[in-house]
Amino acid sequence: MAISTFSIGDLGYLRNFLQNECNWFRICKKTFYREYRSVATSSPTFSLNNKPKKFCMHCEIVIFKRSEEFMFSLAVNGIHFGQFLTGKMKFNKKAVPEGLYYYILELGSITPIDLGFIPRYNSDCVTNMRCVTPEVIYENCSIVCPEEANRLTVKGSGDNKLTPLGGCGAWCLKNGGDLYIYTFALAYDLFLTCYDKSTFPSLAKIIFDMIACESEDCVFCKDHNKHVSQAGQIVGCVSNQETCFCYTSCKKKMANINNPELISLLCDQEINKIDIMYPKIKASLSLDINSYAHGYFGDDPYALKCVNWIPVRISAALSRLIVLSCPVCKRVVMD
């Protein structure tokens, strides 16, 4: 791409995308250059000029240092995109557990340049990061105490406003440059003894699996296959990795239960409907799942079992990996 094709607006969108929508994994570190890659979901603001929209954006950066400045070449989806100069470039390391870490890019203003050559991008290189599993999420979350919950707002204005992620009882807090997912998780002993170990048992996931419709054409209840690998191992779109929080069924009010096998995790009584509820007046985060969902048998209401569920806050490093791997969560958080 020629230098002249980049407007000031283009450069601003590109800089924002590289900093705020990409999780970077280091591919190589050499004396004269370094290379990083990111596998990102489609962006609401940044796109490739004159190219069909892609739901996965595989970005590769090769960086060279010159005096007090940095020069970098960028490729997107295997195609050289451009070369740029900046006075500030910093990769901040974020560690989740042992074996899973990534970098967040900090950039100064960027200017198009021409290095006179296009470096070879290591497009086939695969990261060896540990996957995001339910165990990893349990290891990297904290129980939310009543004092913390009272400081968080689920309805109305406030400094600590939670953004709903789509699923029942799942939110994200933007705190400075950090993201924190808040959700209700199945008690760990129940997860170990009676639940699928490949799926993180959030309240959002359990309720979704109970009430999702069976239509193959439903855009809500069927996997949209537009996630990306949270740890960057796979280039291209993947199915929901069962560790996301975007689960939203086509029906939320008095929805019929189509999968009764999970009822015992929510209620001791027999129920055949779930009613998902949303606060109508200003409210802080409630630690009672009955504030967000209720069970019914016909028209008779039944309270859900709070004892099976723990309110948790997922670490900032892990929350960012999860949110940015999902186009739905990323968009609602960035809006």
Curated annotation (Swiss-Prot):
Quaternary structure, from the entry: Interacts with cytoplasmic envelopment protein 3 and with the capsid.
Principal cellular location given in the protein's record: virion
Family, similarity comment: Belongs to the herpesviridae cytoplasmic envelopment protein 2 family.
Cellular localisation: Virion tegument; Host cytoplasm; Host nucleus
Species whose genome carries this gene: Human herpesvirus 6A (strain Uganda-1102) (HHV-6 variant A)
Keywords: Host cytoplasm, Host nucleus, Late protein, Virion, Virion tegument
Described function: Plays a critical role in cytoplasmic virus egress. Participates in the final step of tegumentation and envelope acquisition within the host cytoplasm by directly interacting with the capsid. Upon virion binding to target cell, a signaling cascade is triggered to disrupt the interaction with the capsid, thereby preparing capsid uncoating.
Database matches in Pfam families: Herpes_UL16
One of the record's GO cellular component terms: host cell cytoplasm
Keyword flag Protease: no
Protein name: Cytoplasmic envelopment protein 2
Keyword Membrane belongs to the record: no
